[in-house]
């Protein structure tokens, strides 16, 4: 593997915003897709996360492809749905963007933990990240299912060996967190500005 498993993500981040600083739909979704192979390396522990992320990318992408000019900018989905009064629906693009962003919050926090806590086991790093990000938005059933799955997290050393490739994995993880985190912050900021950042799982 040329570079690390993060190399495509780091490259994709350069194209996510327009020259005016607006979040572009297609590059953002493509960036999220580059993270799916990273999730694959976790095996069964991340099956739920991968399925959730993949489903939300597909939902947003389908709507984007219905009118690429109209939905060139990521937040247009939300603005259109708010006007149509469907933004709070469980199958809305607004809901999809919110949960996609939250799942990515979890992954960023997980990789922050792996960088900052060299002595933590993988299940410990996963559990801490879940507590800090997704847990408060999940109901009891989702929380129990998620916590059970995270116990299947792979051995940390084996995982690091698999994702390292020929690059500097510590440096790439740090860059991933530092550069991807602000995009997620922007999403939350926008969603909060229209009252859509605090929806819980049903």
Curated annotation (Swiss-Prot):
Transport found in the keyword field: yes
Keyword annotations: Lipid transport, Transport
Positions that bind a ganglioside GM3 (d18:1(4E)): 52, 56, 99, 138
GO CC annotation: cytoplasm; plasma membrane
GO molecular function annotation: lipid transfer activity
One family name in Pfam for this protein: GLTP
Superkingdom per UniProt: Eukaryota
Function: May be involved in glycolipids transfer.
Family that this chain belongs to: Belongs to the GLTP family.
PANTHER family: GLYCOLIPID TRANSFER PROTEIN-RELATED, PLECKSTRIN HOMOLOGY DOMAIN-CONTAINING FAMILY A MEMBER 8
Identification of the protein by name: Glycolipid transfer protein 1
Record organism: Arabidopsis thaliana
Organism lineage string: Eukaryota, Viridiplantae, Streptophyta, Embryophyta, Tracheophyta
């Amino acid at each position: 593997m040329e570079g690390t498993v993060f190399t495509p993500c780091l490259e994709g981040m350069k194209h996510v915003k327009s020259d005016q600083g607006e979040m572009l739909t297609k590059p953002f979704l493509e960036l999220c897709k580059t993270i799916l192979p990273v999730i694959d390396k976790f095996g069964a522990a991340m099956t739920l996360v991968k399925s959730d992320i993949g489903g939300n990318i597909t939902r947003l992408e389908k709507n984007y492809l219905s009118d690429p000019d109209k939905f060139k900018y990521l937040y247009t989905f939300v603005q259109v749905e708010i006007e149509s009064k469907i933004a709070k629906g469980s199958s809305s693009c607004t809901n999809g963007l919110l949960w996609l962003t939250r799942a990515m919050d979890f992954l960023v926090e997980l990789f922050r933990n792996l960088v900052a806590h060299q002595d933590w086991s993988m299940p410990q790093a996963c559990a801490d990240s879940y507590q800090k990000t997704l847990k408060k938005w999940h109901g009891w059933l989702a929380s129990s299912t998620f916590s059970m799955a995270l116990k299947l997290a792979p051995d940390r050393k084996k995982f690091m060996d698999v994702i390292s490739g020929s690059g500097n994995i510590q440096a790439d993880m740090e860059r991933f967190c530092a550069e991807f985190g602000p995009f997620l912050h922007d999403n939350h900021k926008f969603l909060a500005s229209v009252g859509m950042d605090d929806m819980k799982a049903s």
